[in-house]
C-alpha cells in the first residue's frame, strides 16, 4: 500500500514538474525569443540586398539558406544553448553576470582583470546600441507589410511605426505584468504560423531541403568570395537576440529555455527560412518582401497585425533587458544612481527606470525618422550583436579555464571554432560601418566612456576619502569615553565604508554637538552574485552605548531596501523602527575637479557632472525626504 502511495506521489510530482517546465517554456517564448523570432521579417531580404550584387540563382539561394541554417545551428543551438548557458552566475546570465563570474578567481589589481572588466562593460554598452535598433527595425519591418497588403497605405508606415513606439514606451511606467501573461501564447502562435507558412512553400519546392548540406554554404563562399563575406554581415541578422537566451536565464532557468528553443523556436525559424528560400526559387521577384509574400493574399493583413504584435513583444523584451542591465550596472558601481521603480509586487524583476525609458524612446524615434525604412537600418544592426557575441565567447573561455578548470587544449579547440565564427561575422559587419554600423558603435563608445569615467571617478573618491578617513571603532570608543549630549530618538548614518567615520557624523558632532540615544552606521555592499540569501544578508557589531555598525549585503540583481534592513535588524535585536521617527544623516558630496593625479581634468569635469546629476539617495533608497539631514562635504579629485 505504501509503495502504491509513494509511486502515486512520485508520478504526481513528476507531472507537476513537467507542467511547470512547460509553463516556464511558454513564458520564455514570450520574453526570450521575441527578437530572434522576428528576424525572418528582414534577414533573408537583406542578405539579397541589391548592394551585395548577389544574383538570385538557385545555387546562390541554396548557399545563403545553408549559411542561415548553419549559423542558427552552430551559434544558437550549440554555442549558446550547450556551452555559454552553462556559465551561470548563481543561476543568472548576461554579459555583466558573466564578467563578474570570470573576475572571481582573479586578482582585481592585475591587468588581465582590468581588461576583462573593460570587455564586460563594453559588451553591456553594445547591448544598449542593440536596444535602440531592435524596436526600430522590428516594428518598422512589420508595419512595412502594409506596402504589400495595401500599397495605397504605404505612406502611413512611418507615422504608424512612430505611434506604436510612443505607445509602447508610454505604458512602461504602468508595468506590463497583465499583458505580459499573453506574450507567451501569442509568440507560440507566431512561431506556429511562420513554421506553417514555411512548410507550405517547402512542399512546393522540396529541393530547398538540400541546403541542409554545408557544401552549399561552402560553395557559395568560394564562388562569390568578397561578396559572400559581405553577405555574412546580413546572415548574422538571424542571430539577433541570441544573447537574450543567456541574459534572461535568471528569469526562467536554462532547461525551459532549451526546451523552448529545441522544441519550437529553432524548428520554426529553420522551416520559415527554408520556405522563403523555396519561394525565391519559384519566384525571384518575391525578394521585394519574401516573408510577407509567403502568405496567401487573404492572409496578408492578419499576418501584418500578428507581425506587429510580435515585434512589439520583441521590443518589450529588449526594453525590459535595458532596465535590468541598468539596475545591475548601478549596483556594481558602473553607473550613477538612478530612480528605479518596481512595477509589480509579485515579480521582483519587473522594474521601470524612467531616465532609461525616455532616453531610449528619444533615440529610437530619431533613428526611425532618420533611417526611414528597415532596409536602411539593417546595415546598422549586426555590429552590436556580433561585438557582444565575441565578448561573451572570450569571457566564457576565462570561466572554462579559471572557474571550471577544464583542460586548456579542449577549451582552446572549442573557443577557436566559436571565435572564428564570431570574428567572421564581426569583420563582415565592420564593412558596413559607413552604411549605418557607426550608430551602435558610436552609442556603445559614448556609453563606455561614461561608464569607465564613472567607475574610475568613484574609485578616486573612495581613495581620497580613505586617505583622509578616521577609523570608526576606535573613534566610537573615544566618543563614549567622553560622550557629547545624548538626545532621544534614532539616527541612521548611511556610509560607503563601515571601517571609517562617516563625514556626516563628524559634521553633526561639530555643529550640533549631540549624539542620538540609538545610532546605527549602515553600509550597503554589492556582491558579485545576483542574489544574497536573507539569512546571510545582515551582519552587525555592537559598539556599546546604543551604537551599532550594520552591513547589508545585496546581489547585483537586487535593490537595497532601507526599510527591510531596519526591520530585519530590529527583529534580531528586539527593537522597533518607525521611519517617520528616525533621522537619516547623509553626506552630500560635492566633487571638485583639480590637477591632482587621477584622471585628466576634462574627464574629472564629466564625472563631477554625472555625480551632481545622480539620483538623490532619498529617491534611490526610498527614504522619506522629510526625515533626511544632508551635510555637505567637498572632495577634491
UniProtKB/Swiss-Prot annotation:
Signal peptide: none annotated. It is a multi-pass membrane protein. The keyword Glycosyltransferase does not apply. The keyword Calcium does not apply. It catalyses: K(+)(in) + H(+)(in) = K(+)(out) + H(+)(out). It is found in: Cell inner membrane. One of its GO terms (cellular component) is plasma membrane. Its main location: membrane. One of its GO terms (molecular function) is potassium ion transmembrane transporter activity. The chain crosses the membrane at residues 24-44, 64-84, 113-133, 151-171, 182-202, 225-245, 261-281, 290-310, 351-371, 381-401, 409-429, 433-453. InterPro entries: K+_transporter (IPR003855), K_trans_C (IPR053952), K_trans_N (IPR053951), Kup (IPR023051). Belongs to the HAK/KUP transporter (TC 2.A.72) family. PANTHER family: LOW AFFINITY POTASSIUM TRANSPORT SYSTEM PROTEIN KUP (PTHR30540:SF79), OSMOTIC STRESS POTASSIUM TRANSPORTER (PTHR30540). Transport of potassium into the cell. Likely operates as a K(+):H(+) symporter. This is Probable potassium transport system protein Kup. It comes from Burkholderia ambifaria (strain ATCC BAA-244 / DSM 16087 / CCUG 44356 / LMG 19182 / AMMD) (Burkholderia cepacia (strain AMMD)).
Amino acid at each position: 500500500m505504501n509503495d502504491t502511495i509513494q509511486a502515486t506521489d512520485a508520478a504526481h510530482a513528476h507531472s507537476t514538474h513537467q507542467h511547470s517546465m512547460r509553463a516556464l517554456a511558454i513564458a520564455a517564448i514570450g520574453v526570450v525569443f521575441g527578437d530572434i523570432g522576428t528576424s525572418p521579417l528582414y534577414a533573408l531580404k537583406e542578405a539579397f540586398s541589391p548592394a551585395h550584387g548577389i544574383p538570385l540563382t538557385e545555387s546562390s539561394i541554396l548557399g545563403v539558406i545553408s549559411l542561415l541554417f548553419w549559423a542558427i545551428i552552430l551559434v544558437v543551438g550549440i554555442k549558446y544553448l550547450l556551452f555559454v548557458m552553462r556559465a551561470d552566475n548563481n543561476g543568472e546570465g548576461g554579459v555583466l553576470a558573466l564578467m563578474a563570474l570570470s573576475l572571481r578567481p582573479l586578482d582585481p589589481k592585475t591587468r588581465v582583470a582590468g581588461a576583462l572588466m573593460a570587455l564586460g562593460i563594453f559588451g553591456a554598452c553594445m547591448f544598449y546600441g542593440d536596444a535602440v535598433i531592435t524596436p526600430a527595425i522590428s516594428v518598422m519591418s512589420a508595419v512595412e507589410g502594409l506596402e504589400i497588403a495595401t500599397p495605397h497605405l504605404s505612406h502611413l508606415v512611418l507615422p504608424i511605426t512612430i505611434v506604436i513606439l510612443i505607445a509602447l514606451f508610454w505604458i512602461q511606467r504602468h508595468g506590463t505584468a497583465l499583458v505580459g501573461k499573453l506574450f507567451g501564447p501569442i509568440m507560440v502562435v507566431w512561431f506556429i504560423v511562420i513554421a506553417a507558412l514555411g512548410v507550405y512553400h517547402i512542399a512546393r519546392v522540396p529541393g530547398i531541403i538540400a541546403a541542409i548540406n554545408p557544401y552549399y554554404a561552402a560553395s557559395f563562399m568560394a564562388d562569390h568570395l568578397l561578396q559572400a563575406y559581405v553577405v555574412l554581415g546580413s546572415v548574422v541578422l538571424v542571430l539577433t537576440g541570441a544573447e537574450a537566451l543567456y541574459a534572461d536565464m535568471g528569469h526562467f532557468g536554462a532547461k525551459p529555455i532549451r526546451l523552448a528553443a529545441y522544441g519550437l523556436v529553432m524548428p520554426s525559424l529553420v522551416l520559415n527560412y527554408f520556405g522563403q528560400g523555396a519561394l525565391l526559387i519559384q519566384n525571384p521577384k518575391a525578394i521585394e518582401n519574401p516573408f510577407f509574400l509567403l502568405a496567401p493574399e487573404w492572409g496578408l493583413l492578419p499576418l501584418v497585425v500578428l507581425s506587429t504584435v510580435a515585434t512589439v513583444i520583441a521590443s518589450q523584451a529588449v526594453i525590459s533587458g535595458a532596465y535590468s542591465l541598468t539596475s545591475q550596472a548601478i549596483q556594481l558601481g558602473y553607473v550613477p544612481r538612478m530612480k528605479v521603480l518596481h512595477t509589480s509586487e509579485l515579480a521582483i524583476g519587473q522594474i521601470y527606470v524612467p531616465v532609461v525609458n525616455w532616453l531610449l524612446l528619444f533615440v529610437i524615434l530619431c533613428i526611425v525618422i532618420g533611417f526611414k525604412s528597415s532596409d536602411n537600418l539593417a546595415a546598422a544592426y549586426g555590429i552590436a550583436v556580433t561585438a557582444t557575441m565575441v565578448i561573451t565567447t572570450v569571457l566564457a573561455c576565462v570561466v572554462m579555464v579559471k572557474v571550471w578548470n577544464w583542460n586548456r587544449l579542449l577549451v582552446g579547440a572549442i573557443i577557436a571554432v566559436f571565435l572564428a565564427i564570431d570574428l567572421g561575422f564581426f569583420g563582415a559587419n565592420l564593412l558596413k560601418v559607413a552604411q549605418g554600423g557607426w550608430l551602435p558603435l558610436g552609442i556603445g563608445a559614448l556609453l563606455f566612456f561614461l561608464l569607465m569615467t564613472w567607475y574610475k571617478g568613484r574609485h578616486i573618491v573612495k581613495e581620497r576619502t580613505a586617505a583622509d578617513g578616521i577609523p570608526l571603532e576606535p573613534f566610537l570608543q573615544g566618543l563614549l569615553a567622553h560622550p557629547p549630549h545624548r538626545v532621544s530618538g534614532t539616527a541612521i548614518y548611511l556610509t560607503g565604508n563601515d571601517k571609517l567615520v562617516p563625514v556626516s557624523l563628524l559634521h553633526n558632532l561639530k555643529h550640533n554637538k549631540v549624539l542620538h540615544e540609538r545610532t546605527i552606521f549602515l553600509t550597503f555592499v554589492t556582491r558579485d552574485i545576483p542574489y544574497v540569501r536573507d539569512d546571510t544578508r545582515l551582519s552587525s557589531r555592537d559598539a556599546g552605548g546604543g551604537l551599532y555598525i550594520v552591513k547589508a549585503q545585496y546581489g547585483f540583481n537586487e535593490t537595497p531596501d532601507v526599510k527591510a534592513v531596519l526591520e530585519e535588524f530590529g527583529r534580531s535585536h528586539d527593537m522597533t523602527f518607525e521611519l517617520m521617527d528616525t533621522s537619516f544623516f547623509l553626506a552630500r558630496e560635492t566633487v571638485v575637479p583639480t590637477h591632482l593625479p587621477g584622471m585628466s581634468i576634462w574627464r574629472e569635469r564629466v564625472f563631477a557632472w554625472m555625480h551632481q546629476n545622480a539620483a538623490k539617495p532619498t529617491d534611490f533608497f526610498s527614504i522619506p525626504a522629510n526625515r533626511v539631514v544632508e551635510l555637505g562635504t567637498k572632495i577634491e579629485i
